[in-house]
A protein has these predicted regions:
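ATP-binding N-lobe of GHMP and related small-molecule kinases
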Residues: 1-114, 118, 122-136, 163-168
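Flexible, active-site-adjacent loop/turn segments at secondary-structure boundaries
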Residues: 22, 27-28, 32, 102, ...
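C-terminal nucleotide
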Residues: 1-16, 39-76, 86-87, 170-258
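Fold-level recognition of mixed alpha/beta catalytic cores in primary-metabolism enzymes, strongest
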Residues: 108-192
Length: 258
């Protein structure tokens, strides 16, 4: 456990280069961290409370380091992270006053919320330790469990793994979550913000549901169909089995993967 009273961490936003909307289907993606960050600064407050301040959102909250969070409010990733980390042997034993701020645009598709979760996980693990070796992969795994699995959210693994590992990666988003770092620089790439808010969870939930439904419909007719091994020929072979409202999602699931 760290003995210094002040700690600072940061986590980047991310962009998807190839395979957008494929990670929740367990298909591979290529994504890249960007030079916009969420920063966490924390000072020991000699209490048994976490005091969180988020000036960019003009909000704050406090809770006991002993809080169990047996029930979760939707989207409360601070609480779900505490709950998940206890399963990994991470038990906070002193309070901190924590400030989270950053320059990643919110609701802009750059994973600001995942960056907050990754930074929060990293702070807690490094500060209080756990029963496993702390690696970038472990931080990504815990962040994914805290943000997605614990809330039954529709997202995949791309955001948490890209942000926690950093740089550019090729990621298998299936159960293995294996990755390869790509040692290349994307010089001159500019990310523009439209200013139009993105309803991430609502959009992902709808797209994931329809994509999975189209795949499951095909598998009812052919149990050997595997989206990870699908080719363009499979579109012609199976699309007639689908109702009109699912055909586009089946086409996209295969075409985007190739």
């Amino acid at each position: 456990m760290r003995t210094t009273s002040e700690v600072m961490f940061k986590a980047p936003g991310r962009i998807c280069l190839f395979g957008d909307h494929q990670d929740y289907l367990g298909l591979p993606i290529i994504a890249c961290a960007i030079d916009l960050f969420i920063e966490v600064s924390a000072i020991s407050n000699e209490s048994e409370m976490f005091h969180l301040v988020m000036p960019d959102l003009k909000t704050s909250r406090s809770f006991s380091i002993h809080e169990s969070f047996n029930s979760l409010e939707k989207g409360d990733h601070f609480a779900s992270t505490i709950r998940v980390l206890k399963r990994y042997g991470c038990f906070p034993n002193k309070g901190y006053s924590v400030t989270l701020r950053g320059n990643i645009p919110i609701n802009a598709g750059l994973s600001s919320s995942s960056a907050i979760v990754v930074a929060w996980v990293r702070f807690l693990l490094i500060t209080f330790g756990c029963s496993k070796e702390i690696t970038h992969e472990l931080i990504a795994k815990i962040a994914h469990e805290s943000e997605v699995l614990e809330h039954n959210s529709p997202g995949g693994k791309m955001d948490q793994y890209t942000i926690a590992i950093g740089g550019m990666i090729f990621l298998q988003t299936n159960e293995t979550a294996s990755f390869t770092k790509i040692d290349s620089l994307l010089e001159g790439l500019v990310v523009g913000e439209s200013g139009i808010p993105k309803n991430t969870l609502g959009l992902l939930g709808d797209l994931k549901e329809k994509a999975l439904c189209s795949i499951e419909t095909v598998q009812k007719h052919d149990a050997t169909f595997n989206i990870a091994a699908a080719t363009l020929l499979d579109i012609e072979k199976y699309i007639h089995l689908l109702p009109k409202e699912l055909k586009l999602f089946f086409y996209a699931a295969i075409k985007n993967h190739l």
